[in-house]
């Protein structure tokens, strides 16, 4: 680090100017200026960019129980310094960081107490913090409040998340897991709740964006909220307190040993590209003292709780138990080449160590969920944290997800920092949940991989309509700016195949790289991903980046982001309304030919298509995005990466198909249904026969049926006149849209055998006394390149886990030998010819 210091009382050079009681510091590029005023014993400041006021005169100062440091202050000295430091991090939006700023220090005194105000000016914003030096014989201070304000000079709008209340308050929701909203007037901002908002909050003044947040939240202080005061544009800082019971405390004092510091009050200033690309939060934190960082490895993780739609009991029962469900998802991580598997709530020390050993044999490392208070009789208090992590380290655990902090008081910040230090001692990665937002501490503690503090993807299981494209834009330009965000993307469909999302499949795939997180927890099941069109690109997914740039962005409409890992670029885009996105490829290296692997919206939200194009620097790609749509593409110098097999779509309502009985073609304009219609009223023995199904070769193909059903229904499936299985059970759309709205779409994937040519038929026939669902379309594609040549799969989701617990057979925890069983249809029997049998992609050898 290069640091230069100069007392202002001796000289001021270049960008630094002093006027009597005014002390000015400029950013390194000279465009941004902050002036600290000392007038009649009171401190205040203003900020401008190119002589245009961003922050009008705003008060400064602290109050303590022993002294009021907001008035009657006398100047001791002022100093200026500069910082120009470069550093690397193993995780983040970039690998190379530069911390370049100019610093102003204004030291004042009142009696035997001193107050130092530190300002940092970066090219992309400013920050200030307080220091109470150890002086006058004082060893500590009880701080009670601060006078700091950020008075926006020309307030136009704010994108902010209302504070919902700590666990000690009246609201049961954790404060950082609410939705952001756009406030177009100061009156609506002050009139919502108690006027307090989480940070970060995004402000717009008609020309500039300003992101208000904090940096360097550690054990020495609590975090703060932003409170909208009655004066338009005026934000104050509201502390979260000394202890977790702050909401019921009568004494709100914060005890601080001297020297005492507050976190940095941070304001990023500039256009929306500047907001997205800033690394100011990391720059404001101290460098790490850790010397060995080689063990810190970002990556993608499978996650049973997310893959089972939030740990729903019916799914756990279907797998045969929690342990068996966990193992199925651990094998998903192995199959996808992901380095991690997260074991969530409910694990037991009676089986977990063996689970980790077997996972390691498959090349998967395990992460462990832990309640911040108590879980499985493990004492996670400060006193016993070391012993607990030492034991988990002996089990082979690589990282921990610590949940339910539900507080960000000084007491909790102290406990979190104890966790950071203890986890570093045992080389364990850290993921915080039920917690506050990040504050740049991955510079100090690089093993902090990600954290929650977000209304994330898991909310899809309960409130699918609220996790909208607008919400995703809101958090992209607020919460994810200040640090890694464990959004838990995926959610393409529920375990039973219901497409709960109101966004497109392309949109949900885009979120995998649109958001930044050192551990990307995929909320999906093995069943959904086995034949998913995005499977190949998900196998290659990075979790940390060498470079991140915003190609285009409007916080109320759309965003297109490019992130680089090595020689490959990953470009993702989302939108609120339908649009054509023009991606300028001027960020590619000149002279190199790349291949773009593009996954984009298809004909409707439940449809996604793949295409492959050669591109070079200077090319433009135009990609159509549906409303609530999106895309993801990997641009690589390699032209031979795995791609999904070609899919062919057949509309149910097409005139080439044969309908019989009560079945009818119906016209409907739908978000998730394609082709403008569907086939309904299929009952009482009626048939829907898809004709002219084409196959390039004789062999196994994957049939995906898109259907609409408010309740569970059954039918027969016939391929070329021969029935597949006994009964196909179509599960209810569940919590999708109500009634028989085609926007409530589900899918089912079934292996079938087709003959070469275009004369294959696929028939769905209702039973004589039953009604089948409504049908939108089917798709046909060959098996993936890494699938078995022959695969025998159950034909219904009920039979996927039959009474004899096929999953037990495949689980390493079951003492029964696999070679004692064979497949008969989709069920196992006690005797069979010798050979290899396949269930869910797992080989079963009968000797």
State where each predicted segment sits.
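C-terminal outer-membrane/trafficking sorting elements
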Residues: 7-9, 802-847
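N-terminal accessory beta-strand-rich subdomains and adjacent acidic, glycine-rich linkers
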Residues: 22-281
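Solvent-exposed beta-strand/loop surfaces of large extracellular or lumenal domains
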Residues: 79, 83, 93-95, 162-168, ...
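An acidic-aromatic substrate-binding cleft motif
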Residues: 257-332, 336, 340
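Aromatic- and carboxylate-enriched substrate-binding clefts and catalytic-loop regions
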Residues: 342-504
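Carbohydrate-binding surface patches
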Residues: 554-590, 631-634
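C-terminal beta-strand-rich structural cap/linker in extracellular carbohydrate-active enzymes
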Residues: 614-643
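Extracytoplasmic
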Residues: 641-802
């Amino acid at each position: 680090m290069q640091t230069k210091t100069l007392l202002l009382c001796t000289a001021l050079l270049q960008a630094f100017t002093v006027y009597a009681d005014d002390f000015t510091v400029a950013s390194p590029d000279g465009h941004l200026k902050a002036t600290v005023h000392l007038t009649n014993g009171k401190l205040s400041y203003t900020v401008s960019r190119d002589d245009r006021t961003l922050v009008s005169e705003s008060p400064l100062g602290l109050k303590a129980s022993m002294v009021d440091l907001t008035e009657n202050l006398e100047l001791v000295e002022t100093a200026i310094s500069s910082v120009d430091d470069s550093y690397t991090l193993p995780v983040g939006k970039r690998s190379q960081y530069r911390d370049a700023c100019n610093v102003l220090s204004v030291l004042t005194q009142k009696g035997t107490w001193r107050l130092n105000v530190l300002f940092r000016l970066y090219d992309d914003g400013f920050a200030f913090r307080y220091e109470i030096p150890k002086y006058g014989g004082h060893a500590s201070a009880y701080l009670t409040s601060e006078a700091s304000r950020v008075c926006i000079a020309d307030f136009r709008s704010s994108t902010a998340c209302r504070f919902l209340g700590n666990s000690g308050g009246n609201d049961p929701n954790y404060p950082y897991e609410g939705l952001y909203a756009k406030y177009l007037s100061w009156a609506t901002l002050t009139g919502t709740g108690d006027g307090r908002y989480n940070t970060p909050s995004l402000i717009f003044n008609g020309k500039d964006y300003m992101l208000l947040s904090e940096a360097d939240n550690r054990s020495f202080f609590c975090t703060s909220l932003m409170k909208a005061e009655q004066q338009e544009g005026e934000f104050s800082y509201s502390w979260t307190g000394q202890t977790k019971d702050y909401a019921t405390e009568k004494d709100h004092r914060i005890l601080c040993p001297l020297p005492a510091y507050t976190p940095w009050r941070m304001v990023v200033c500039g256009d929306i590209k500047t907001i997205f690309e800033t690394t100011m939060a990391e720059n404001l934190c101290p460098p790490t003292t850790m010397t060995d960082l080689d063990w810190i490895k970002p990556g993608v993780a499978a996650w049973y709780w997310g893959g089972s739609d939030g740990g729903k009991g019916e799914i756990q029962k279907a797998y045969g138990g929690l342990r068996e469900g966990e193992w199925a998802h651990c094998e998903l991580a192995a199959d996808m080449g992901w380095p991690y598997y997260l074991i969530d709530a409910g694990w037991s020390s009676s089986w977990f160590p063996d689970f980790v050993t077997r996972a390691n044999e498959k090349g998967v490392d395990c992460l462990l969920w832990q309640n911040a208070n108590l879980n499985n009789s493990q004492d996670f208090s400060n006193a016993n944290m070391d012993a607990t992590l030492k034991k988990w380290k002996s089990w082979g655990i690589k990282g921990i997800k610590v949940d339910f902090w539900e507080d960000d008081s000084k007491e909790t910040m102290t406990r979190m920092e104890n966790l950071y230090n203890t986890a570093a001692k045992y080389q364990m990665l850290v993921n915080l949940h039920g917690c506050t937002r990040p504050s740049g501490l991955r510079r100090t503690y690089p093993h902090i991989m990600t954290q929650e503090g977000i209304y994330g993807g898991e909310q899809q299981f309960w409130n699918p309509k609220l996790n909208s494209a607008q919400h995703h834009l809101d958090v992209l330009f607020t919460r994810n700016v200040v640090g890694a965000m464990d959004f838990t993307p995926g959610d393409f469909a529920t375990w039973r195949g219901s497409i709960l999302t109101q966004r497109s499949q392309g949109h949900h795939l885009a979120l995998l790289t649109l958001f930044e997180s050192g551990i990307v927890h995929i909320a999906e099941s093995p069943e959904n991903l086995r034949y998913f069109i995005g499977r190949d690109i998900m196998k290659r997914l990075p979790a940390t980046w060498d470079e991140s740039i915003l190609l285009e962005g409007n916080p109320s409409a759309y965003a297109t982001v490019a992130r680089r890992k090595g020689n490959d670029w990953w470009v993702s885009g989302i939108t609120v309304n339908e649009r054509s996105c023009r991606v300028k490829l001027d960020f590619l290296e000149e002279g190199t030919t790349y291949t773009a692997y593009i996954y984009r919206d298809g004909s409707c939200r439940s449809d996604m298509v793949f295409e492959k194009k050669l591109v070079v620097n200077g090319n433009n790609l135009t990609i159509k995005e549906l409303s609530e749509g999106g895309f993801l593409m990997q641009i690589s110098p390699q032209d031979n990466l795995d791609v999904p097999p070609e899919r062919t779509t057949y509309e149910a309502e097409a005139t080439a198909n044969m309908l019989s009985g009560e079945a009818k073609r119906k016209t409907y304009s739908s978000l998730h249904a394609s082709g403008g219609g569907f086939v309904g009223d299929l009952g009482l023995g009626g048939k829907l026969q898809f004709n002219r199904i084409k196959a390039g070769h004789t062999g196994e193909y994957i049939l995906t049926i898109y259907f609409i059903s408010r309740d569970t229904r059954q039918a027969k499936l016939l391929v070329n006149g021969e029935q597949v299985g006994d009964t196909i059970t179509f599960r209810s759309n569940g919590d999708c849209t109500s009634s028989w709205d085609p926007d409530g779409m589900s899918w089912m994937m079934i292996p079938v055998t087709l003959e070469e040519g275009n004369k294959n038929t696929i028939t769905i026939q209702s039973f004589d006394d039953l009604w089948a669902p409504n049908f939108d379309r089917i798709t046909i594609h060959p098996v993936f390149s890494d699938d078995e040549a022959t695969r025998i799969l159950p034909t219904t989701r009920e039979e996927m886990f039959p009474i004899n617990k096929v999953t037990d057979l495949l689980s390493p925890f079951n003492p029964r030998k696999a070679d004692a069983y064979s497949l008969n249809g989709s069920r196992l029997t006690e005797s069979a010819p010798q050979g290899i049998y396949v269930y869910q992609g797992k080989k079963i050898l009968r000797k």
